[in-house]
Amino acid sequence: MATTSTGPLHPYWPRHLRLDHFVPNDLSAWYIVTVLFTVFGALVVTMWLLSSRASVVPLGTWRRLSVCWFAVCAFVHLVIEGWFVLYQKAILGDQAFLSQLWKEYAKGDSRYIIEDNFIICMESITVVLWGPLSLWAVIAFLRQHPSRYVLQFVISLGQIYGDLLYFLTEYRDGFQHGEMGHPIYFWFYFFFMNVLWLVIPGVLFFDSVKQFYGAQNALDTKVMKSKGK
C-alpha cells in the first residue's frame, strides 16, 4: 500500500497504510464482541443439550464438550471465515455485521483488510476443508460413526498447522500488522483468539492418537490370540 501525506485516516497498522475505500464501523467494538460471544454461547448450549438427546449412545462430559467445539468450529469456519473468503475485497467499505466484525478484528491483524496472499489462501483452505469436516465430525460423534476419531485427528492437525503458519508468518514480518502489546488488539484479538486453535486442537489431536493406539493394540491382541489357538 502507498503512504499518505496527511497521516493515516484509519486505525490499522502499519500506520502508513493507504486504505482509500475504508469506511469506519458504525457498530461499537463491545457490541460486535458481545453479539459474537452470545452466538457462541447459544451454539454451545444448544449442542450440549443436543448431544445428550441425539446421540445413539450416551456421551461423557469430555466427548460432549468436543462435540460443542466442533460445532463452534463449523460455524466459525463456514460462516465467519466463509464471509471473509467471499467478500474480502469489499469488507473494507462494507457495513454488514460480519464485515464490521472483520474490520474490528483487523485492528489486531491488518492482513485481513490488505488482501494478504497467505491469509486469503489459508482462510480459503479452512473454509473448504475444515468447515465441512467439522460439521461431519459433529454428526459422526452423535451417530458413533467409525470415522469420528479420524475426522478429529485430521481436523485438529490441519488447524494446528494453519495456526502455526499464521503466527510464524506474522513473526517473520516483525508483528507489523498490529500494535504490538496492545491489551485488546494484540493480546485478545491476535493472540488469545488464535491460540485457542492451538491448545484445544492439540488436546484433541493427542486424544485421537490415544484412541488409535488403543484400537490398534486391541486388534493386535485379538490377532495374536487367534494365532495362538
UniProtKB/Swiss-Prot annotation:
Molecular function per GO? C-8 sterol isomerase activity; cholestenol delta-isomerase activity; cholesterol-5,6-oxide hydrolase activity; identical protein binding; steroid Delta-isomerase activity
Q: Which UniProt keywords are given for this protein, alphabetically ordered?
A: Cholesterol biosynthesis, Cholesterol metabolism, Cytoplasmic vesicle, Endoplasmic reticulum, Hydrolase, Isomerase, Lipid biosynthesis, Lipid metabolism, Membrane, Nucleus, Steroid biosynthesis, Steroid metabolism, Sterol biosynthesis, Sterol metabolism, Transmembrane, Transmembrane helix
A single GO BP: hemopoiesis
Q: Does the keyword ATP-binding apply?
A: no
Q: Where is the EXPERA domain?
A: 62-205
Pathway in which this enzyme or protein is active: Steroid biosynthesis; cholesterol biosynthesis
Catalyses which reaction? Answer: lathosterol = 5alpha-cholest-8-en-3beta-ol; zymosterol = 5alpha-cholesta-7,24-dien-3beta-ol; 5,6alpha-epoxy-5alpha-cholestan-3beta-ol + H2O = 5alpha-cholestane-3beta,5,6beta-triol; 5,6beta-epoxy-5beta-cholestan-3beta-ol + H2O = 5alpha-cholestane-3beta,5,6beta-triol
Q: How does it sit in the membrane?
A: Multi-pass membrane protein
Span of the signal peptide: none
One GO cellular component term noted in the UniProt record for this chain: nuclear envelope
Segments crossing the lipid bilayer: 30-50, 67-87, 119-139, 186-206
Q: Where in the cell is it found?
A: Endoplasmic reticulum membrane; Nucleus envelope; Cytoplasmic vesicle
**The protein's Enzyme Commission number:** 5.3.3.5, 3.3.2.11
Tissue distribution is: Highly expressed in liver, bowel, adrenal gland, testis, ovary, and uterus and less expressed in brain, cerebellum, skeletal muscle, and heart.
Q: What family is it from?
A: Belongs to the EBP family.
Query: What role is this protein assigned?
Result: Isomerase that catalyzes the conversion of Delta(8)-sterols to their corresponding Delta(7)-isomers.
Misc. comment: Binds to the phenylalkylamine calcium-ion antagonist emopamil, an anti-ischemic drug.
What protein name is recorded for this chain? 3-beta-hydroxysteroid-Delta(8),Delta(7)-isomerase
